[in-house]
Amino acid sequence: MKTRDIVKEAVQKLGYKKLRKAQIQPINDLMDGKDILLIAPTSMGKSAVFQVPGLAQAKQKPGSWVLVIEPTLALIHDQVRRLREKSISAACLTGENAGNGDDVLTQVRRGEITFLFTTPEQLQSYRFQTMLVPNHNPWLVVVDEAHCLTEWGSFHFRPAYRSIGQTIQKMKHRPVVAAMTATAPMRYRIDIVLSLGMKKPKLHYTSLAKPNLKLVVRDYTLDTSVLDSLPVSKREKKRQLEKLREKTLQNKLKEAVRLIKKYGSGGSVILYATTRNSVEFVYNNLKEREELKGQVVKYHSGMTAEKKNKVLGKFLSGKKRIIVATSAFGMGIDKEDVRLVLHFELPLSPVEWYQQIGRAGRDGRDAHVVLFYQEDDIKQNRAILAGKKTMREIEELPDTLQSITLDEIQTSVCKLEALVDLLHQDSCLFQGLLRYLGEWNAPACGCCSICQRNRKKKGV
């Protein structure tokens, strides 16, 4: 068969009617043996870019296989499940199935597996390094969600990310390398290319704009001016401040319910909170609301793998419509009907914010993304990043910040400051976010809360 026919067959087997324009050239480059750096929005269909050539190569050269490195178990399980549903040979090697690791790798060596999904940590395991690295090499290595290499790849948090390039260099037959992400400012791109040892990679960039998303920021900053003028003791002022905080918290919960009913009734809802404790608090409140009973689940890294998998399955299948989660959830999760993404608290960086709002509107229909902004959140996040939380409060730390060095703290605080500056600007929120991500020619979206406010000022 001709290569064109083999690719067409692969496209059909994967269930696609046809490839999108933005997918064709990256696929051609991989088929030609060229490294690629693909930067595209979450709804672009990046998985097809490595799945199509992976199937085509296996057809042309039986025994060829693709190694896909993912940051989270949820993403691995989702990818493997989707491929198996299409009768495509896919497997995973994670800490969960390490006991069967030898069997999985033996299947790969026999040519029985076309796609093997793993984590950076498992890639560095003795089993992997001895059974596959010396001889039975993949023809393609894919680093999915490649921004994690820069965001997470540190000596203290996930150092294995920094060893991926070294593992590739050890391989007897150097594979083609593909790095894919939706969020890579220029310094991220340089870091990814150098760390992975990519050879003259072809850059494929698709605009990160999402015209179907309506971006709204709600300011819940406490007005303490009245308290400051009260002729009462400091103790009484503190008590009044706590009452004001509690009232604001209840107002946020009421507004969250209103938004879920208004925008989320036609599909699914993801509600993000910064810490596990916040997730538990919001979840416990929402699940008791009469109009939401039986619809809400929670997800964070403090839960067992079995529990998280069950929750993920219920949400993806539509059995549960609303999920309250930390940043441990959502990266790469493909659920088309998410109509609302709500941040109950301030995210930690512009990159994290963009990644999470990218869960909404993947079907191309209008969706809303709402951020509850509060000065107290900034103080909380700064305190977390600066390491001022004590070890006994470790459960309150975001899932990605359980361990962090001083240099990493300073870098993370800079990212937080960039997000705060973005929220304080008088111009389009989406435009500012895209410019941070390197898309300098991004136009104003015309529909975010800032654009709407400016339009009202002009009387348009």
What do these predicted regions represent?
Residues 2, 159, 411-414:
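Alpha-helix N-cap/N′ positions at the starts of helices
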Residues 5-10, 18-21, 31-47, 54-58, ...:
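Helicase motor core with emphasis on the C-terminal RecA-like subdomain
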Residues 293-294, 396-460:
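C-terminal accessory/connector segments of nucleic-acid motor ATPases
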Residues 379, 386-405:
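Interaction interfaces in information-processing and related assembly proteins
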